[in-house]
């Protein structure tokens, strides 16, 4: 969970009230956080957040805003945000090239002027940058933030691609380095360059005079990308692969700088094609949708008897604009710096926090039940223990993936796979129908580790099913991969026999026609004359698609069928 370190004096100054340590500890609980340590000597407080959905709280400005709003009940306003029907004047432009749109598509920015950066302010900004990029940004893969002195930048800015031979002087270095050299030798390149695996073009941020701002999300340039104490005019940009996450991150930083005393000047981003919010977006941009909440639903879940007016007042203590037109419903508008309202229940939780947990009496459950594992979970655990006992290491993968990994590299038509409508990124456009592509992808990036490699996963897969009412069917599958130059069909056949022996299940095999396997070295697994899975040596063609140079054997089997 995210941990931040902030100056206590700055926090209290922004709150506008001298709270005792006890009062501070109590009110910080409303942010789903707790104080780990109070360092009186260095004037610092260490806070751990128990929720990753509130990145707006990971700074002294954001936390102070939350506490101040909770105490006053006044919803903060930010008049520099654009909306669909109310676009702000912009003071700079960013042009996105079609080439970079397919690599790391989204970038937004704004200008901040009017304050002098002191040491503590700069430290707070750098910490926010790191927390947003690392925690919320999934180690810069989802989003990453860059900060610059705008005095050195000539607008408009161009967000383009470059080859691995392109050179500039990166931050922390005194000599020019190519993109390839940065990826291999610069500390940030070594840490984050895996974001750009299997690409031959890289993202680059240039100003109008072709000065390099940064190689996002890896490293800024030394000449323009150095922010220091005494700077007054800032340019902030956020790049990412998720449109809403990128917009939200920029909004959070804009609100923080505004609360620090900066004047926020919007910047327009122009994309090569339409996005969910248009081809041109002036940022900071308010994109969140309102929610309609039923009063009875709130009271039923909380065991309360609150009116719509009561609920609206409680929500305003958390910075949420709320109003009602009828006594049985009300509407909320999420704050510009939040996007964690996915369901009515999320709003009900906020009502409870706004009312105060101490105002709800605890009750013992009226019904007594005993929980237990489902049969499929018990069986899965048995299979998992057997795999670990046979020397395999368990993996856990996402259920979503790309067309490239699930279809093209596997050399299948993919007609049975389920696709996601309007995916935000090509990396998550299909629901997996097999675990094997994930195992092969892991093997493709593991060539530097000693062989043999033996990995497995027990997880869900989904396929189209025209017979069922939903049109889909979900299975629990076991899949494993063995990689070594000595492995062959005999080794995996022996392992399959051992697995079924310990499960006390009889099985038969017949030659498989799947193009996943080398001809004559793949087999279907039949239990009670029903095909439940397959195993064999992976075809060199498919191994080459994944960039794997070592022979691999794989198995995948439906464990629902084994249990039945």
From Swiss-Prot:
Keyword Metal-binding assigned: yes
Pfam families according to UniProt: B5, tRNA_synthFbeta
Official protein name in the record: Phenylalanine--tRNA ligase beta subunit
GO cellular component, one term: phenylalanine-tRNA ligase complex
Keywords from the UniProt entry: Aminoacyl-tRNA synthetase, ATP-binding, Cytoplasm, Ligase, Magnesium, Metal-binding, Nucleotide-binding, Protein biosynthesis
Assembly: Tetramer of two alpha and two beta subunits.
Binding site for Mg(2+): 340, 346, 349-350
Catalytic activity annotation: tRNA(Phe) + L-phenylalanine + ATP = L-phenylalanyl-tRNA(Phe) + AMP + diphosphate + H(+)
GO-annotated molecular function: ATP binding; magnesium ion binding; phenylalanine-tRNA ligase activity; RNA binding
Entry-linked SUPFAM superfamilies: Class II aaRS and biotin synthetases, Putative DNA-binding domain
PANTHER family: PHENYLALANINE--TRNA LIGASE BETA SUBUNIT (PTHR10947:SF0), PHENYLALANYL-TRNA SYNTHETASE BETA CHAIN AND LEUCINE-RICH REPEAT-CONTAINING PROTEIN 47 (PTHR10947)
Enzyme Commission code(s) on record: 6.1.1.20
Domain of life (superkingdom): Bacteria
Example GO biological process: phenylalanyl-tRNA aminoacylation
Underlying gene: pheT
Domain B5 per the UniProt entry, residue ranges: 286-362
InterPro entries, per database record: aa-tRNA-synth_II/BPL/LPL, DNA-bd_dom_put_sf, Phe-tRNA-ligase_IIc_bsu, Phe-tRNA-synth_IIc_bsu_arc_euk, Phe-tRNA_synthase-like_B3/B4, Phe_tRNA_ligase_beta2_arc, PheRS_beta_core, tRNA_synthase_B5-dom
CDD domains: PheRS_beta_core
Cofactor(s) required, per the database record: Mg(2+)
Location(s) in or outside the cell: Cytoplasm
